[in-house]
Regions:
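Charged, cofactor-coupling segments
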Residues: 139-186, 234-297
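Amphipathic alpha-helix from the class-I
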Residues: 42, 183-193
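Active-site cores enriched in adjacent His and Asp/Glu residues with nearby glycine-rich loops
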Residues: 55-144, 191-233
């Protein structure tokens, strides 16, 4: 047998490889390759740790680049600059050919609930239909939240982290919803361990958000993402996927992003996203910086 990732290679490349092994039966190797890549080596995990430290250092400087009167895209550009100066490579790699974005997204107000054709937790309209995702020149307004969600590619391995900022004070509902997301993170961190199925972690998050009364705003409003986490690695969307009916079990060495988020209409997104590594006993956070809503001034 000869294995090739048929959903990654172009037809021309696929046919060329098949021609090199005329006696072999070419089969789709994507599932095997993705399964192998879902468990990282100690060297790879160390790369994630270093990336997480650099990512956090950039995020800690975000309040210093805010200026009153900014739009979301102006704010995004300044944050991207912080990331690049910290060593970010500035490229966001994804699996497959149907999803693309620059370095991530900065979403504020109702743009956070804008439907997207991409499989993101939150989409955004973007600057043009040619790339429908992220900031759309929305002014940063008093009483609205801003979610910064940039992929941290500092050494080829993609960290993922989201933090929330506010322009002035937010309605109390937003702070309550943000705490619900932190509670989901804490609950999942307490039960996640090798052997637990991804669907159990997703169902646990849904139970918490339903009990809190935010199910209709969880992971979006009109278009709600049906996952709360995803594997990360050389690409931002690797296995495992924390989603309903996913029987795959966590294994030591897996690295994933957990991102419970809620969108409050008229206010914007709240929630949290961190990168985690599965250990022999549970999971360990790789992206560490302030998780509360930070007021900008």
């Amino acid at each position: 047998y000869s294995s090739a990732a048929s959903d990654v290679y172009k037809r021309q490349e696929y046919c060329r490889l098949a021609g090199l092994f005329p006696e072999a039966e070419v089969v789709n190797g994507t599932p095997l390759i993705r399964q192998a890549r879902s468990v990282k080596t100690p060297v790879e995990i160390e790369m994630f740790r270093r990336s997480g430290i650099a990512h956090a250092k950039a995020y800690e400087q975000i309040p210093g680049v805010y200026r009153p009167g900014m739009t979301d895209i102006e704010f995004s550009i300044e944050i991207e600059r912080l990331m690049r100066l910290q060593g970010c490579l500035g490229i966001f790699r994804v699996f497959g050919r149907s999803m693309e974005i620059f370095m991530g997204s900065v979403l504020t107000g109702d743009n956070a609930g804008y439907p997207s054709p991409y499989d993101f937790a939150l989409g955004g309209q973007g600057l043009d239909p040619a790339l429908p995702g992220g900031a759309n020149k929305t002014p940063l307004k008093e009483g609205q939240s801003v979610m910064v969600d940039l992929g941290g590619n500092f050494n080829g391995y993609m960290n993922d982290m989201s933090r929330v900022f506010s322009i002035g004070k937010l309605p109390e509902e937003a702070y309550t919803a943000h705490q619900v997301c932190l509670d989901i993170q804490e609950k999942i961190a307490s039960i996640a361990r090798p052997g637990i199925a991804c669907e159990v972690l997703y169902d646990t998050a849904v139970e918490v958000v339903k009990a809190a009364g935010f199910a209709d705003k969880f992971m979006g409003t009109g278009q709600q993402a049906k996952f709360i986490g995803h594997g990360i690695g050389l690409e931002i969307n690797e296995a495992p996927v924390l989603a309903p009916r996913i029987k795959q079990q966590l294994e030591p060495g897996m690295v994933f992003a957990l991102e419970p988020k809620i969108v409050i209409p008229g206010v914007g997104p709240v929630g949290i996203e961190n990168s985690w590594v599965v250990t022999n006993e549970g999971i360990e956070k790789l992206t560490n910086c302030n998780e509360e809503i930070i007021e900008l001034s």
